[in-house]
Structure formats: C-alpha cells, structure tokens
C-alpha cells in the first residue's frame, strides 16, 4: 500500500488535481489499484451540480489515469519521468459517483513499449461498475 506522501513522490499532481488518496495494490509497470475518498469538500462539487453533487466523469477518468501513472512511474527506469495522456477509447460511465462514495480505481496495462502504453481502467463503488475504458499514455523525461 502507498500513502498519499508516497504517491506524491511518484507523480507530480497536487491538490486540487491529485485525485487518488492511496494505492492499495501495486505491480510496477503492470497494474495498480487506487482509492479516492469522495467528499463534499471537493472543489468541483460547487458547480457540478449545486443541488445534486455528482463527480464529473472526466475526473473519474483522470483518477484512473493517475492510478496508471503510479504503476508506470514506479518502475526504476521510469522514475523522474512524466506520464501524459495519449488517448482514451471506449470509455463508458455506468453509474454516478456521489460525495461519501469510495471510488476504487484499477488499471492494468495490456502493453507498454518504448515509452508508449495502453491499458484498461475500471472504476467501481461498493463493487458496482461506475466507469470503464481503455487508456493510452506516453512517458517523457521532458516536462
């Protein structure tokens, strides 16, 4: 398990855009399982939506990407590099995510070669699927 401090030592994201609270499982370069405790204090709930707060789907995808970045950048040869989104395919949102939910984020890489990777991301709340799709990323030593 990785704490928030250990996550911040691997990826450059910071509040309010750091969207994972801990890593529960990690196989460097292969897969990671992360967790986001969704609270009413999240800045995006002020406008999405004031009377019915729902976590924006694009931020669920970003949380999956950050989880994947932890897995990719945990490899010794990738330390200090940056992971950039290269694309997303087939993303589907199945259920809304509300304040009070614990978002479980699992990313598994299907292939990774020469700094380009592709994987599958699945987000669940209480075992129920809320989002899934394919994520593509590129690693770079230049920020």
Curated annotation (Swiss-Prot):
Q: Name one Pfam family in it.
A: FabA
Please provide, alphabetically and separated by semicolons, the GO molecular function terms listed in this UniProt record. Answer: (3R)-hydroxyacyl-[acyl-carrier-protein] dehydratase activity
Where in the cell is the protein located? Cytoplasm
Active site positions, chain numbering: 48
* UniProt record, GO biological process: fatty acid biosynthetic process; lipid A biosynthetic process
Note the InterPro entries from the entry: FabA_FabZ (IPR013114), FabZ (IPR010084), HotDog_dom_sf (IPR029069)
Reaction(s) catalysed by this chain's protein? a (3R)-hydroxyacyl-[ACP] = a (2E)-enoyl-[ACP] + H2O
Q: Which UniProt keyword terms apply here?
A: Cytoplasm, Lipid A biosynthesis, Lipid biosynthesis, Lipid metabolism, Lyase
Domain of life, source organism: Bacteria
Enzyme kind, highest EC tier: lyase
Q: What is its EC number?
A: 4.2.1.59
Its Gene Ontology cellular component terms are: cytoplasm; membrane
Family label: Belongs to the thioester dehydratase family. FabZ subfamily.
Q: What does this protein do?
A: Involved in unsaturated fatty acids biosynthesis. Catalyzes the dehydration of short chain beta-hydroxyacyl-ACPs and long chain saturated and unsaturated beta-hydroxyacyl-ACPs.
Record HAMAP family: FabZ (MF_00406)
Its name, as the record gives it, is: 3-hydroxyacyl-[acyl-carrier-protein] dehydratase FabZ
């Amino acid at each position: 398990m990785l704490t928030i401090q250990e996550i911040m030592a691997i990826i450059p994201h910071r509040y309010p855009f750091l969207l994972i609270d801990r890593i529960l499982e990690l196989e460097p370069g292969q897969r990671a399982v992360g967790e986001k405790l969704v609270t009413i204090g999240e800045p995006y709930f002020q406008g999405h939506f004031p009377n019915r707060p729902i976590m924006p789907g694009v931020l669920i995808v970003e949380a999956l990407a950050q989880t994947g970045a932890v897995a990719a950048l945990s490899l010794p040869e990738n330390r200090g590099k940056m992971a950039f989104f290269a694309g997303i395919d087939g993303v589907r949102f199945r259920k809304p995510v509300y304040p009070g939910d614990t978002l479980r984020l699992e990313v598994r890489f299907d292939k990774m070669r020469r700094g380009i990777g592709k994987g599958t991301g699945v987000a669940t709340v209480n075992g129920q699927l809320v989002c899934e799709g394919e994520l593509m990323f590129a690693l770079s030593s230049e920020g």
